[in-house]
Each structure stands twice: as C-alpha cells, then as structure tokens.
C-alpha cells in the first residue's frame, strides 16, 4: 500500500473523476435505473470496499457512459464545470424525484492536504433538521490516515476498513437504507434521468461539451418538484487541486416510524399519508389512527413542545376509488375526527437522539418475548419468530450507530451472540426443550464469517445463521397445537412438503413403497434448508393474500421479469413478487421490512451460489456434485482482471478474440485440418501483444485471513513434478514457460501474463498443451479463471473433445453449454461442469474424489505454446459469481449433429478414456520409435511410453497420487502406484493401455534428460521460472512404445525418497499383490505353468501350426509366448529355429520378439486408421464427382447466360444513349428551372415593392379622404349654424315687427273697405292708423336681417363637395319625395272654411 501525502494536478483530476463516476454508477445501481446484470463488481483492495461499474450493455447505458466520459470529463478537465446536477424523474416531462448536485471548485495551491469530510446535514419535508456525523476526532479523514499502515498490518487494516465501512454505512443508514423499499419500486417502472451542467462566468458562451447543448429558461422551468423535497449535504472531498461537494434533494420519505404494538400482538399496519409514493394508484387502506408530531426544537426552559412548530399527521383510513375527491380536504376531515382521540407524541428517530428508539425497541422485544408461545399455524409461528429476530437485529444496528464504536463489525458480532441467545429462548419455548441445546448446536457462527469487516460482513454472517437456524426449527411450525400429553411423532420431509403445498388439480402417482422414506428434518441440515426455502415463499404468499398460490405459480410469472433478462432464484422471485403488490407495506412492520431488505441485499449473493439450472428449473445442492477433500476453506478475493499491456489512452494493446470462433457447424473430413479454422498468429505477433518472457510482475496481493496469515496452503509442486507433467501430456517438444509459486503465491494471484493450473488436470484428466479452444471459450464466456475448474470439469471437457474428434466433429462451446451445467461445489470458488441428465455423454462411474489435487499447482505463461487462443480466457483472479448460461428457446444449428456424433463414439466410460487414446485422437500420436538393435548391443533400455493406469471404480483413488516435493511428508517425486504385472498388465491396442509404474519411473528418469531441458531463470529469492525448450534438431526423442522387462522386481524410488503409505485405506505399500511368488510359497520357480500351447498336428510343413495363448497378459506383453510365436515365423526353405529357451541371448530375443509384435500391432492400428480415412476419402471422391457434375452444369448455364448477356449488353448500349439524351434534357430543364427560380425571385422582389407602394398610396388616400370629410363637415356645420341663426332672427326679431306691420296695413285696408261701404270713421283715427302703419313699416325697413343665398340653403352632399360621381348615382324620379297631395287637401279644407264663414 502506497502512502500518498501530496497529489499533482493530474492525480487530483483522476481522483475526482473516479469519485464522480463511482457516485453516478452506484446511484444508478441503488435506484434500479438499469438491470442488475448491467453492473460489474469492482473492489478497492486498499480500503476493502466494493463498488458497481456500469457496463455498456445497451444504448441507454452507453449513452450515460458517454455523457460522463466525453461530456462531463471534458468540462472538468478544462476547469469549466461548476456544478453537475443529476436528476431522476418519473417521466420525460417530470416531476422530479431526486436531485444530486456535485459542485466543483479548483485551486492551484499545493499546500492543502487531501481530506474527506462526511457530514450529513439536511432539512426534511416538514421543516425539521437532521444530522449524522462522526466524532470530532474522526469527522475529517486524510488520505494518509486511509492509506498508511504499520508493521501490524492485519489489526490496523481491519480498523481502517471498519472505519471506512462505518463512514460509508453512516451515510447509507441515515438516508439510503431508509429508502430501500423505494429502491425496488424503481426496478418495476421506467424512470427518466437528466443531467445538467453549470459553468463559471469566464467560460466562453459558445462552449458546449460533447452530448450537451444549451438550455432555455422554459426547459429549466419544466421540471418541478411535486412537493417540498428533503435537502441533504453529504460532504466534500478535497484533493488539493479539486474540491468536490455533494448535495442531495429527494421527495422520497426517508422516515418510516414504527407504531407501538398492542399487547394482544396484532399485526403492525403501516399508514399511508397524502405524500406517499403510492398515491398515484387508488387503493383502499385500513389502519389504526395515530399521531406523529415532528418538532424542530424544544423549549429548553419548560420542556414543552412549541405549538407553532407542530404538524399533526394522521393516516388516511380509507381512500376511495373516486378520484374527484380532494385529498387535502379528506386529510383535514380526518384530522378533525382524530382531535378528540387520545394519542401519544412520538419523536422522529432521526431528527432526535436514538436513545428513545432504543428504549422503545427494548420494550417491544420484551413484549414479543413475553407473548412467544407455540403457534397455531406455521404462518403465525414464522411471522412471530421473524419479527422478533429482525427487531433484535435492528435494535443492535441502531445501538451500534449511536455508540459510534471504532470497529462496527465487533459491535454487530456481539449483537449476533445476543440474537443467538434470544433465538434459543424462542426455540426452547416452541419445542419445550432447554435453550442451551440450540444455543450451542445450531447457531454457532463460523470463524470464516469474521473475515469480512464492517457491517456488511456481520449482516452476512447473521443471514447465514438465520438460514441454518430456520432449517433446524422448520419442522416445528407444521405440528398442530393439541392439549394431549402424548409425544408428537416427527414429521418427515415428504409430509412437510405435502402439508405446505396447495392441492393440485392433476392426480399424482403414489411413490413406490420400496423407496425408503427420507430422514427427519433434524438429520440433514442442507435438506432442511432446502425445505425452508420452499416454505418461506408459501408463507410470504399467504401473508400477502395469495393463500391459494404456490411457489410454482410465482415461478411461472416469467413475463414480469423478462425485462431483466436474468435467471432469478426463488428468493428473488418472491421479493419482486411482493414488490408488485402494494399491500406488502401493510403486511410487514417497518422494522421487519427494514431487515428484510438488508437480508435480501446481502443474502442474495450467498443464495445464488447454490442454485444452478437443471432441466430449465432451479435446484439447490444436488447430491451428485463433485466433492473435495479439502480440510480448510479459502476466502475468494473479488479483484479485477488486467491486460498484459496498455496502449495509448489506456486501451488494451491486445484485445481479446471473439469468444466462439466456431460460429457455424464445421464437420471435419480430416482430423489434421481440425484446427485450421481458428485464427492463426505468428510468434512475433504474439510476443508484440503480450508481455515479454523475462518480465514477471506480481501485482496482486495475497488474501489475508483474520489472523494475518495467507489463506490456503503453499503449493507442493516442484520443478521435477512439473517436468513430469509436461512429459506425460506429450509436451516435451514445446517450449513452455512455467513458474513454481512462492511462499505468498496462491492460485488466485499469479503474475501478469500467467495462469494457474493444477497437476491433476494432466495426470488424472489427460489434458494436453496447448489448452483447447473449447475450454478457453468456456472460461471467457463465464469470466472465470482457469484454476476455478475442478478436475471433474476437465474430465468432461476432455471426453467431449475426444468423442467428437473420433467421429470427425469439433465440439464448440455453444453445443457444450447445451449438454452441461455449471455448478459450485462446497469449497468456495471452485466450480464443476456436469452433464445434463438427458445429455450424459460420459456414463458409468465418475471419478469425483481427486485426493489433495488443489495442493499441486503451478503457473504457466500464456502464449502460442500453452494456449490455442493466447488472447482469450486469460483471467487470473477468481470470481465469486460467474456469468450464468442463459439458454435460448432454440438449440444451435449444429447441436443435433454434434450430439449424435458424440453418442456414436465407442467406449464412452471414463475408464476407457486413456492418455494414449486422447493423444492418438487429438492428433498427438508419437512419431518416433526405438530401434530393437539397441537391446542386442547391451545398451541401456529405451524409455517406455508414459501412459496412465486404468481409472479406479466405485470412488477409489485416482491412478496416481499427485507428486509432492521431498521433505517431511516423505512422498515420492514420481508417486505412481505400483501395478501387479500378473494381474493388471494388459494393453488394449485401441487405446486402453496400462503400463507398469516400474517402466514409467524408468521412462521418467530417462526422459528427464531427453524430452525436456529446463532452463532455470531466477526471478526472486523463493521462486524461479523454468523454460522447457525443445531438444536439438539432431537428437531423436525416443518416445516409442517398447516396454521393459517386467520379470525383474526393481524398485522405483530413488535413495532417500520413500513412498506414501496407504495403510489407512487398507491397500498396503506400493500396491502389493495378493498372490505370493513361487519362491515365497516354497515351490520350484521353473514349474510355473505355460501361458501358451503350440501344436503342429500331422502336417509336415513347418509354417503350419496352431498357437493357443491363455495368459492373463496381452500377447505382446508376454515375452516368452511372444518369442515362441516369433520363432515359428519362417521363410520357405529355412531350417527350424532353435527353441528360444535354449538361446544364449534368450532375453534379448524375447525383447526383440516382443518389440516386433508391438510393431506389428502398431502397423495393424496404422492400417486400420488408414483404411478408415481412405474410406472417408473415397466418400469424398464420390462427393467430388457429384460436385464435378454440378460444375459442368454450372459451366453450361454460364455459357447460356453469357449469350443472354451479349444481347443485354446491346440493349444496355441503347439504353445508355437514351440515358445520355435524357440526361441532356434533365440538364436543360435544370437550367430552365434555375431561370424560373431567378425570375420568380425577381417577381417576388417586385411584388414586395408593389405592396409597399400600395400601402403608401392607401395611407395617403385615407388621410386625404379623412381631411376632406373633416372640411366638408365643417362647411356643412357652418351653413347649418347660419340657417339656425337666420331662423332664430326671423322668429325673435323680424317676425313680431313684420306681424305688427301686417296688422297695421290690414287695419288700414279694413278701414278703407268699411269707408267704401258707407261707414264713417273719424279723420283723427285714420291719421293715427296711418301713423301707426308708417311707424311699423319704418321699423321693418330699419331691420338688418341675415340674408341666405342659394348656397346657404342647399345642404346636398354635392354642394358640400362630398358627393359621388354622376355616373355612380342612379337616376331617381322624385329624389326627395312630394307633399303636393297633403298641401292640396289642406288648401281645400281652408278654402271650404273660408267659404262657410263668408256665407
């Protein structure tokens, strides 16, 4: 671990970007924005923290990654970014659900220290405040404090990790875990994520990073909050040059206060307020009334609650389906109804201290413990037990958070002991037995669980104990409660499942009576655990109202989970099923659901390990899984795989090849061409893309247990044992590079460019180099390390490849996955590949018990010599959860052919799969043989073939024990078991060869020099790299099949090396024979019976004889019989050959005869192989003839087509001319179109000008007309005023005077008339009358009256100047009408009246 005190600007930028990316990706994971399979586990070994990394699985995930890496990082690198706001909305148009604000500030000062301050403060929805900080001594944490270590690495590392875990979970508990039930609802609905960037003022206005654009004010105002959000300030990280501050806003209610339970143990019901998450779905909820008062502060003097700060909250007792009802009014009405009811004031557990909550939970636990009794039903019993245990755990978590212990894991561990005692009390009450039995026997935590530091490990250990304890008491809840004192019979597993499984409509066949019944639940914990797994879903289903549904009904709802495209285990199906029902909030109390969410979070990964796919169903812990003889368990690290080299920009210089290069079905005609379909690489290309051979870098730290010791054991492999393995698998002529792990190296931390392998892969499983592409593709698809496979899995790979190659097929990975399943074994980290029941291509007994195979491992460099595909399947670190195989509805196209070919193979049992058979079929037949003349010259015997012994049956040990180094254990370097020559020395020419260990040892000693020449290169003090180079070109490698003499009892072990004792298995020393020799029995050794009989009969011909062999060995292995048979093989005319027993060179002749017969046997095998391939070639010739006929027909058709093509070419020329003319016309039309476009544009310009001119003229005429109308109106008004003045003058002034004058004149005329008629009037009166008339006339004449002209009297519009043209006026006969008739009538009436008066 590197201690860092100062960071440069580049390191500061990297730290800030990594923190930002981790925050965004973990928020996406916690809130369920993407499916779980889109995230990859990452870890920080220095801090023991696990994170989630979003992988580009689809367009949406790639888009979010592009926003971060190309957009946000660009602005951050240029120091333009001020704030990054990450929104989570319900829909595209809002409203907002959560808002994460990341603020950035930049500094060029190097004087600051790298610090992290986690201080959670916030304001809730109702105005209250919340705080969650560490002590003053640990509130701020520098990078040195996080990374520095001293000599006591284990203790300080655990304390530092526990502190970091506490800091992380203090944030998690105060905000995220309280919202955990809301996180799962995100997965069932679609959410919209938005990202907004704010820049500093100095940033250019036109700057926009990739994937981002400018935002208008209308768009910003579009997204609003549905209610007042909760505001929280998480803290800040100062990395010297960059300061990152995090704030959160959310409308999700983080508070989930628990209601006090009644004394009668009624179920807790959860109230639903107007701001609940489920208000968008109308439902009917019934709860008991309650009051909750959230306070911001208290009066310190009087201790009373401030009435102004109170907010009364009551549950909605019933929400009807009527959506028109105002929820606010409904809530206020409920407030009025509850005002008169007594209620207790409950303080919020997060706003106030935790002490009240702890006291409350203590009282609740006392009530639970007091009311625990034998349940009436299994549902009630499990509910009460689970409520009590979950409340106890929640209480301990809150107590540990309140006390702020330095190591939170120890506090939780101590709480688990109290949980154990509490559970024991419950169980003792349920079973009427002492509590000590269950406290000591069934709830003991394994020490391995203590190695996981922090709260996560403690909850994980508690979850494991919960399942084990549930398995032990599972049978209690199905026993009915009776008052009888008689002992209750134990319920078997079959009766348990029958009672818990709902009745089915289909009749079930009764099980045969011959099958024995299963043991009671208390006998097998694993079986009872499986029963509990089937019980819990049924209990939860009945708890949610699904009483008539079973687990199968839940599992069939696959359409709901097709969105995730993953295989869900039963527990995950049940949880997601519960999330679909809104009543789940009412079925469990708040504390129960809180712990249930934690258990689901941390217990899901543990449960998935033991669940695999078998016949499209999920099962747990099958009984036929491969077991291991390991006595110690290992902690599996979860690390990241790294490339060998990095190119520019951090990209891989050696990208991995496609996983499955055999995408199509590929039948093989010749086995030698089998591997031509894979990509070919040159040695220079591979060396350029991989690390250099001399470069060895151990970049992975070993896993340390709780007592600071490296887990697992050091390897027992040595350079000699690895050389023996290479020679055994026929790789002596390949320049392989291997490394023996040192004291601190284990299978999961090899150096870069190396992978770990076990010797059992090659000794017992017959694997070879280079590693086949099938295994590499399988590991690449599963993201597993090579060393995670068990030898049983390698056996299935080797058998599938061998059987397929015998029939001319190369098995690809897709077909292999359809025939097999991947399953975890009991040893953590190891996985076995088993055949499916319907596709069991390897029948018979399986070799599943490889003794101590995991103790012999070594590292091999990945190159062309060790891997067929050196750029794939190079994962070094182990993974806890390999990628599962997701079967498609249809099988691959080539599956049927490959499956039939494998099942056509002969001798498909594992004992028939031998090393010689594998070498011969997979193209590794030995090509050099020993000369028999070497034995005649008294030369050292040649090496014998290295072949495996026959595999044992019925669970016996493997053919050879793994070799170990010489030392205290005293185990032989070669360690092959001795085989009795008289009982087991048989050889099958087809491939089932068994060679005595004596010859194998001699062959090993001779081949240790001839086959390989190791070159040791010292790398460190305790490890070395061994390169096994090829022998010189001039030397011939003697790897023939000649067998040494077996009659001599020679010891194989070298001086100072002893064999492993097998007395514990009753097998004696080096496989002692049950038969005694003749000398030991006191008999004459020469009297041994003959194994053959030679008879010539009555024939005189020397080459006509009958040879009958009755020995237990094969003829080619019996030297005496072979020599007598060989001596009778003579040419015509030759003399009889002497008896071989009388020869001087008897032994030499016997060896020669035996070698000759072996050569003949090999020739027979060679001819048979040639005949088989020749038949294939003949079949190919027939196919070639058919192909030739087809080719001739194709040529004729081609000639006919050429003739037709000539005519078509002529037509094409004509069409070309037409096309040319049409192109010219198109050009002319295009030019005309351009002219018209120009003319159109000109006309548009002219139209605009005309419109402007028309508007100007219209305005001018309108103004002129308005002025003229104004003038005309003024003129008419003036005339009218003059006429009015005239009329008034006439009426007021002129009229009276004129009337006086008229009266005077009338009087004068009347007097004149009277005087003419004889009347006498005085002269004075006449003169006075005249004077009066004259005076009146003078007055009238003296008047100056207004005179009206014709223009003044004419009021016509024509005279006023506001008239239309004459042509526009229609002629009218009497325009103004006439009153002649009226006047005439008036005149007649006046005249009549005058006449009457006159008369």
UniProtKB/Swiss-Prot annotation:
Keyword set, alphabetical order: Chromosome, Coiled coil, Meiosis, Nucleus
Sequence ranges of Polar residues compositional bias: 617-631
BP-aspect Gene Ontology terms: synaptonemal complex assembly
Location relative to the cell: Chromosome; Nucleus
Protein's job: Required for normal meiosis.
Pfam families: HORMA
Coiled-coil segments on the chain, per record: 1205-1246
Comp. bias intervals (Acidic residues): 257-266
Protein name stated in the entry: Meiosis-specific protein ASY2
Annotated region (Disordered), positions in chain: 257-281, 487-525, 617-656, 940-974, 1045-1090
Entry keyword annotation includes Transferase: no
Coarse class of the protein's main subcellular location: nucleus
UniProt keyword Nucleus, yes or no: yes
Range of residues in the leader sequence: none
């Amino acid at each position: 671990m590197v201690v860092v005190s100062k960071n440069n600007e580049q390191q500061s930028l990297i730290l800030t970007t990594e923190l930002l990316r981790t925050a965004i990706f973990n928020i996406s994971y916690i809130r369920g924005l993407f499916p779980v399979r889109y995230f990859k586990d990452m870890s920080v070994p220095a801090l023991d923290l696990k994170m989630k990394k979003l992988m580009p699985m689809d367009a949406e995930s790639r888009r979010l990654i592009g926003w971060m890496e190309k957009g946000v990082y660009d602005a951050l690198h240029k120091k333009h970014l001020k704030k990054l706001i990450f929104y989570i909305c319900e829909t595209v148009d809002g409203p907002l659900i959560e808002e994460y604000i990341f603020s950035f500030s930049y500094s060029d000062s190097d004087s600051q220290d790298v610090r992290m301050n986690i201080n959670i403060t916030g304001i809730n929805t109702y105005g209250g405040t919340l705080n969650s900080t560490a002590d003053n001594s640990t509130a701020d944490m520098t990078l040195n404090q996080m990374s520095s270590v001293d000599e006591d690495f284990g203790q300080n590392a655990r304390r530092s990790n526990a502190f970091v875990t506490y800091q992380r979970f203090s944030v998690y508990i105060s905000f995220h875990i309280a919202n955990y039930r809301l996180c799962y609802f995100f997965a069932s609905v679609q959410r919209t994520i938005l990202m907004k960037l704010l820049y500093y003022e100095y940033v250019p206005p036109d700057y926009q990073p990739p994937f981002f654009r400018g935002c208008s004010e209308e768009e910003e105002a579009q997204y609003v909050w549905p209610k007042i959000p909760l505001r929280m300030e998480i803290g800040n990280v100062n990395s010297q040059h960059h300061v990152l501050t995090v704030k959160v806003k959310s409308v999700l209610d983080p508070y989930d206060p628990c209601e006090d339970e009644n004394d009668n143990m009624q179920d807790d019901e959860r109230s639903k307020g107007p701001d609940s998450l489920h208000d968008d779905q109308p439902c009917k909820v019934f709860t008991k009334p309650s009051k909750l008062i959230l306070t911001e502060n208290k009066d310190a003097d009087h201790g009373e609650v401030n009435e102004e700060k109170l907010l009364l909250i009551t549950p909605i007792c019933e929400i009807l389906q009527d959506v028109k009802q105002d929820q606010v009014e409904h809530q206020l009405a409920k407030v009025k109804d509850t005002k008169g009811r007594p209620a207790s004031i409950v303080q919020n557990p997060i706003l106030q201290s935790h002490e009240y909550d702890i006291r409350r939970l203590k009282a609740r636990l006392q009530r639970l413990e007091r009311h625990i009794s034998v349940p009436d039903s299994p549902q009630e019993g499990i509910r009460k037990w689970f409520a009590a245990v979950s409340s106890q755990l929640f209480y301990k978590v809150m107590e540990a958070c309140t006390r702020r212990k330095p190591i939170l894991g120890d506090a939780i561990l101590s709480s688990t002991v109290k949980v154990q005692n509490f559970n024991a009390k419950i169980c003792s009450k349920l079973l009427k037995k002492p509590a000590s039995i269950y406290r000591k026997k069934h709830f003991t935590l394994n020490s391995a669980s203590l190695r996981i530091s922090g709260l996560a490990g403690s909850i994980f250990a508690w979850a494991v104990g919960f399942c084990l304890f549930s398995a032990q008491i599972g049978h209690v809840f199905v026993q009915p409660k009776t008052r009888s004192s008689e002992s209750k019979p134990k319920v078997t597993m079959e009766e348990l499942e029958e009672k818990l499984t709902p009745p089915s409509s289909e009749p079930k066949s009764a099980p045969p009576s011959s099958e024995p019944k299963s043991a009671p639940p208390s006998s097998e914990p694993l079986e009872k655990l499986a029963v509990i797994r089937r019980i819990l879903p049924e209990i939860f289903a009945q708890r949610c109202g699904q009483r008539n549904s079973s687990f199968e009904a839940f599992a069939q709802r696959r359409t709901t989970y097709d969105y995730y495209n993953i295989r869900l285990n039963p527990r995950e199906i049940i949880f997601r099923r519960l999330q679909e029902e809104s009543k789940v909030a009412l079925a469990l109390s708040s504390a129960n659901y809180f712990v249930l969410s934690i258990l689901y979070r941390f217990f899901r990964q543990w449960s998935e390990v033991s669940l695999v796919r078998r016949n499209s169903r999920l099962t747990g812990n099958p009984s036929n899984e491969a077991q291991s003889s390991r006595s110690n368990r290992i902690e599996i690290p979860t690390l990241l795989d790294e490339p060998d080299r990095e190119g520019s920009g951090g990209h891989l210089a050696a990208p991995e090849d496609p996983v499955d290069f055999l995408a199509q079905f590929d039948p093989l005609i010749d086995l030698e061409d089998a591997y031509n379909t894979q990509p070919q690489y040159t040695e220079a290309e591979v060396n350029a893309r991989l690390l250099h051979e001399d470069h060895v870098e151990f970049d992975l730290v070993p896993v340390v247990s709780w007592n600071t010791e490296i887990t697992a054991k050091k390897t027992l492999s040595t350079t000699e044992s690895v050389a023996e393995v290479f020679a055994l698998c026929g790789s002596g002529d390949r320049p392989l590079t291997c490394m023996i792990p040192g004291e601190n190296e284990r299978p999961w931390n090899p150096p870069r460019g190396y992978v770990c392998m076990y010797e059992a892969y090659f000794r017992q499983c017959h694997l070879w180099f280079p590693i086949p592409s099938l295994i590499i593709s399988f590991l690449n698809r599963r993201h597993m390390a090579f060393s995670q496979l068990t030898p049983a899995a390698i056996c299935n790979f080797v058998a599938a490849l061998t059987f397929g190659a015998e029939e001319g097929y190369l098995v690809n990975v897709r077909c292999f996955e359809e025939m097999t399943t991947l399953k975890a074994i009991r040893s953590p980290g190891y996985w076995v590949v088993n055949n499916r029941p319907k596709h069991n291509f390897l029948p018979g007994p399986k070799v599943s018990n490889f003794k101590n195979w995991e103790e012999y491992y070594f590292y091999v460099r990945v190159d062309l010599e060790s891997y067929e595909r050196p750029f794939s399947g190079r994962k070094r670190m182990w993974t806890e959860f390999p990628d599962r195989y997701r079967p498609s509805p249809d099988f691959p196209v080539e599956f049927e052919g490959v499956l039939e070919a494998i099942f056509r193979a002969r001798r498909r049992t594992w004992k028939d799969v031998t090393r010689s058979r594998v070498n011969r079929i997979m193209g590794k037949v030995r090509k050099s043989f020993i000369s028999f003349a070497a034995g005649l010259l008294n030369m050292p015997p040649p090496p014998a073939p290295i072949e495996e012994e026959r595999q044992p049956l019925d669970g016996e040990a493997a053919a050879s024990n793994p070799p170990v180094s010489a030392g205290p254990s005293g185990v032989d370097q070669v360690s092959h078991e001795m085989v009795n020559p008289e009982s087991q020395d048989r050889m099958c020419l087809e491939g089932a060869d068994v060679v005595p260990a004596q010859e194998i040892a001699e062959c090993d000693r001779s081949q240790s020099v001839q086959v390989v020449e190791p070159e040791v290169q010292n790398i460190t003090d305790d490890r070395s790299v061994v390169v096994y180079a090829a022998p010189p070109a001039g030397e011939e490698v003697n790897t023939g099949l000649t067998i040494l003499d077996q009659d001599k009892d020679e010891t194989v072990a070298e001086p100072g090396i002893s064999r492993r004792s097998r007395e514990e298995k009753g097998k004696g020393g080096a496989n002692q024979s049950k038969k005694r020799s003749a000398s030991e029995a006191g008999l004459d050794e020469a009297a041994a019976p003959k194994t053959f009989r030679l008879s010539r009969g009555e024939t005189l011909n020397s080459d006509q004889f009958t040879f009958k062999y009755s020995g237990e060995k094969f003829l080619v292995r019996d030297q005496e019989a072979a020599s007598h048979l060989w001596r009778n093989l003579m040419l015509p005319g030759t003399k009889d050959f002497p008896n071989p027993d009388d020869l001087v060179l008897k032994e030499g002749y016997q060896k020669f005869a035996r070698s000759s017969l072996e050569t003949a046997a090999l020739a027979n095998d060679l001819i048979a192989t040639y005949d088989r391939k020749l038949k294939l070639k003949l079949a190919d010739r027939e196919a070639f003839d058919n192909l030739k006929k087809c080719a001739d027909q194709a040529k004729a058709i081609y000639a006919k087509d050429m003739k037709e093509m000539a005519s078509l070419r002529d037509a094409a020329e004509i069409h070309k001319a037409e096309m040319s003319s049409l192109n010219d016309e198109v050009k002319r039309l295009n030019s005309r179109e351009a002219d018209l476009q120009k003319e159109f544009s000109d006309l548009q310009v002219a139209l605009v000008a005309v419109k402007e001119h028309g508007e100007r003229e219209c305005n001018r005429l309108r103004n002129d007309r308005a002025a003229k109308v104004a003038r005309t109106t003024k003129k008419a008004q003036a005339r009218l005023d003059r006429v009015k003045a005239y009329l008034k003058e006439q009426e007021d002034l002129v009229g009276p005077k004129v009337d006086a004058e008229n009266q005077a004149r009338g009087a004068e005329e009347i007097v004149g008339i009277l005087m003419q008629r004889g009347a006498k009037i005085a002269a004075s009166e006449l003169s006075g009358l005249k004077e009066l008339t004259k005076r009146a006339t003078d007055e009238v004449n003296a008047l100056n009256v207004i005179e009206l002209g014709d223009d003044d009297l004419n009021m016509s519009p024509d005279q006023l100047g506001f008239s239309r043209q004459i042509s526009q006026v229609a002629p009218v006969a009497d325009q103004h009408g006439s009153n002649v008739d009226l006047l005439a009538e008036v005149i007649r009436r006046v005249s009549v009246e005058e006449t009457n008066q006159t008369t």
